[in-house]
């Protein structure tokens, strides 16, 4: 027996690694693999990429009114592949929001919000709001004109909340004006608080998802576990559309002869 096999047996005996891997990877997929099942996994991969690129940016970023913009400029011009690092983080955030919207739409179409998956749906919606909070808090961090004025608009909207709006605005911006305290608060929320809450809810979301399984698409035949074959490619859709609309239809005149 090789050293690798012995190490694998030892880990399986102590920690159950092979059993855990079979549980994680041996998930039944109703109707077989399809594009509509990709959005959740793609979103998780994008979130992990955001964490990795965000950690790389945090090594060089300085959350200060005097040095925030210059540190971002340093990352893009002096750090090796810094422009790529920031580009992946910046554009990856936009892609993550789009994929989250697609994932939400897919769950709506499949009825994944119904019993017994209501809690999975509610946590997913909460994760979407947290993702938008990531976008809001991260937009200010470069301390450029777009981030500054976008944050002022967001804080002005927060100030309109009845009773506690003014307190929320002062708490978020660190006083009466915008400056270093605003940056440090947004940075702490963006890099520490939101990731902890987000990853915890992701774990709960995945556990609930694995408990109830994938919601089968409406086209899956009842009791068969598979979907009828359909041509979903561009050429297949074109052929189906042409066949349907080019069929001769009986003429039904709107007039009647005397």
Predicted regions, residues:
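Membrane-embedded alpha-helical bundles that constitute the cytochrome b-like, heme-associated redox core
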Residues: 1-258
């Amino acid at each position: 027996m090789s050293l690798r096999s012995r190490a694998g047996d030892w880990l399986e005996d102590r920690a159950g690694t092979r059993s855990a891997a079979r549980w994680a990877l041996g998930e039944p997929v109703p109707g077989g693999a399809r594009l509509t099942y990709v959005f959740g996994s793609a979103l998780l991969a994008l979130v992990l990429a955001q964490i990795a690129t965000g950690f790389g940016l945090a090594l060089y970023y300085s959350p200060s009114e005097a040095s925030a913009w210059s540190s971002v400029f340093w990352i893009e011009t002096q750090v090796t592949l810094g422009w790529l690092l920031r580009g992946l983080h910046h554009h990856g955030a936009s892609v993550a929001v789009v994929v989250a919207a697609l994932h939400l739409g897919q769950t709506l179409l499949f009825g994944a919000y119904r019993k017994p998956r209501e809690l999975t749906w509610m946590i997913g919606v909460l994760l979407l709001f947290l993702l938008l909070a990531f976008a809001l808090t991260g937009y200010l961090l470069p301390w450029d004109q777009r981030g500054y004025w976008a944050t002022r608009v967001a804080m002005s909207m927060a100030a309109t909340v009845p009773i506690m709006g003014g307190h929320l605005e002062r708490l978020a911006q660190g006083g009466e004006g915008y400056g270093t305290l605003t940056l440090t608060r947004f940075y702490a929320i963006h890099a520490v608080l939101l990731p902890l809450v987000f990853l915890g809810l992701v774990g709960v979301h995945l556990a609930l998802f694995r408990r109830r399984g994938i919601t089968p698409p409406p086209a899956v035949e009842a009791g068969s576990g598979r979907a009828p074959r359909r041509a979903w490619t561009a050429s297949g859709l074109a052929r189906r559309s042409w066949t349907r609309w080019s069929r001769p239809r009986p003429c039904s005149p709107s007039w009647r002869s005397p």
